[in-house]
């Protein structure tokens, strides 16, 4: 597995050389950011420049080619103005799941309202519902099912925050804080992430049932 501290040092040195005095924010998302990485985990880097051009994208691409484990590097690259005016319902999870390396997203996060979080929950659950039905009928893919459980885990983080005002970043902590049905969904996600066997029909039905309760509710379900 990657020694992430050493990787970040090399990454930030290369970033500053590629974009001197232009990095407004840099951070780490995903499993490495949460301390939950496995051998298969991507390195999800977040970079917000003062502004972003097509030429900057090419420069960043060339910079990544100089780094170790290039095939594992992914993430988010944007200009500051674009991020500050992003769809607010998408900013909740984005900001909460990002560990700052340089700068802060607090100002961006402060613009996110309870209604934005509710919209993120509804949209996320609807996406999981549609994906689950589609996969049960057509692709019948274990990998797609795993991805849908991952998406559901993010929705559950938002649901718990909307109920309690507490963002639980680590899934192992969140699973014990949720009601039984939601906890079971998250437990399945954690088992799959750790290499557990896919029981396609049962796991698809579990996810379909949970997501359908949110997708089928008029407006937003009461999270109390």
Where are these regions (language model features)?
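Metal-dependent nucleotidyltransferase catalytic core
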Residues: 1-18, 34-40, 46-88
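Short, polar/flexible loop-turn hinges at active-site or ligand-entry regions and domain interfaces
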Residues: 49, 55, 102-112
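Conserved nucleotidyltransferase catalytic core and NTase-mimicking acidic/glycine-rich helix/loop elements
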Residues: 9, 104, 110-224
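Ordered, amphipathic secondary-structure segments that act as subunit-interaction surfaces
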Residues: 84-107
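Helical scaffold of the NTase/Pol beta-like nucleotidyltransferase catalytic core
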Residues: 1-25, 185, 218, 222-224
